Regions:
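N-terminal secretory signal peptides that target proteins for export/translocation
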Residues: 1-6
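Bacterial N-terminal signal peptides
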Residues: 8-19
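Non-catalytic accessory segments of hydrolases
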Residues: 23-177
Length: 177
């Protein structure tokens, strides 16, 4: 599972950087389709791509299986909305993950990319942030971590959702057969 995530993350970053080098700031082509980013509300020098699918929705027959490749699509998708957080128990009001109205779904394997709005042919540092939460809570959306401040300083920042609790970490021989 980690290897597939790593391959997709590297692919997204490489495409983002290559598109920035050629001045195409608002659209990124991936193996699954083309996404159109938007300007960060925190800093107009940053372009944000939210809700980029890195795997097929892990529902139905895919629920207890390793991630499958993202489902290809035609046209251009607006990458301007935070995806749902992966399914998790409701947290107490004291939890950092309880802020706001957290939408939860099993269809949650998405990532977000924050990058400088001005193109650069230089190699850029990349930071991939996986939220905490003890493998039971959290999400990669900007409610918890917004990569705009690092992106405006020249880094490419990627945040990601991953399956939580039993949906992501349940181990049983019947599930692998």
């Amino acid at each position: 599972m980690f290897r597939l995530k790593r391959v997709w993350l590297i692919h997204i970053v490489a495409l983002t950087i290559s598109n920035l080098a050629f001045g195409q700031l608002s659209e990124v082509a991936t193996d699954s389709g083309t996404y159109r980013g938007h300007i960060s509300p925190i800093d107009e020098r940053v372009t944000v791509f939210q809700g980029i699918g890195y795997a097929a929705p892990p529902v139905g027959d895919l629920r207890w299986k390793p991630p499958s490749p993202a489902i290809p699509f035609a046209g251009v998708r607006e990458a301007d909305r935070v995806s749902a957080a992966c399914w998790q128990a409701r947290n107490s009001d004291a939890s950092v993950y309880a802020r706001g109205n957290l939408n939860r779904s099993e269809d949650c394997l998405y990532l977000n990319v924050f990058t400088g709005a001005e193109g650069s042919a230089a190699d850029l540092p990349v930071m991939v942030w996986f939220h905490g939460g003890g493998n039971t809570a959290g999400h990669g959306g900007p409610l918890i971590f917004d990569g705009s401040n690092l992106a405006k300083r020249g880094a490419v920042v990627i945040t990601a959702n991953y399956r939580l609790g039993a949906f992501g970490f349940l181990a049983h021989p019947a599930l692998t057969s």
